[in-house]
């Protein structure tokens, strides 16, 4: 098994409900270690930059408005197969389809307000980590 890093974000719907600790506890219980973390309130421009891959999708405006509507927690997680493990712990994007015990099944309000974001591949993990963190902010 490979030790890798992934990007994780706790979204505004979850921070508003004080779920940061509960979500982080689920990630840590799955064997993921937080090696960088900060609380940020994205500007609309930052949200548009972070989600630029979706700029031509019909939900882009709603997504970026939501992501800039309150604080988020951006994190770098480390562990064996961290990308796949994080996605497993998060659950399906649509909470109605998420497995019991996953973050989205337990905490998400809707498909849009689904509490967390996580990288889907090593390349996106590297890009998303670099968007929010400098190398000196990541302490393993």
Curated annotation (Swiss-Prot):
Its main location: cytoplasm. Major role in the synthesis of nucleoside triphosphates other than ATP. The ATP gamma phosphate is transferred to the NDP beta phosphate via a ping-pong mechanism, using a phosphorylated active-site intermediate. This is Nucleoside diphosphate kinase. Gene3D superfamilies: Nucleoside diphosphate kinase-like domain. Homotetramer. It is found in: Cytoplasm. Its EC number is 2.7.4.6. One of its GO terms (cellular component) is cytoplasm. The active site is at residue 117. NCBIfam families: PRK00668.1 (NF001908). One of its GO terms (molecular function) is metal ion binding. The lineage of its organism: Bacteria, Pseudomonadati, Pseudomonadota, Alphaproteobacteria, Hyphomicrobiales. It holds the Pfam family NDK. It is an enzyme of class 2 (transferase). It comes from Brucella anthropi (strain ATCC 49188 / DSM 6882 / CCUG 24695 / JCM 21032 / LMG 3331 / NBRC 15819 / NCTC 12168 / Alc 37). InterPro entries: NDK-like_dom, NDK-like_dom_sf, Nucleoside_diP_kinase, Nucleoside_diP_kinase_AS. Keywords: ATP-binding, Cytoplasm, Kinase, Magnesium, Metal-binding, Nucleotide metabolism, Nucleotide-binding, Phosphoprotein, Transferase. GO terms for biological process: CTP biosynthetic process; GTP biosynthetic process; UTP biosynthetic process. Belongs to the NDK family. The keyword Membrane does not apply. Its cofactor is Mg(2+). ATP binds at residues 11, 59, 87, 93, 104, 114. It catalyses: a 2'-deoxyribonucleoside 5'-diphosphate + ATP = a 2'-deoxyribonucleoside 5'-triphosphate + ADP; a ribonucleoside 5'-diphosphate + ATP = a ribonucleoside 5'-triphosphate + ADP. The keyword Cell cycle does not apply.
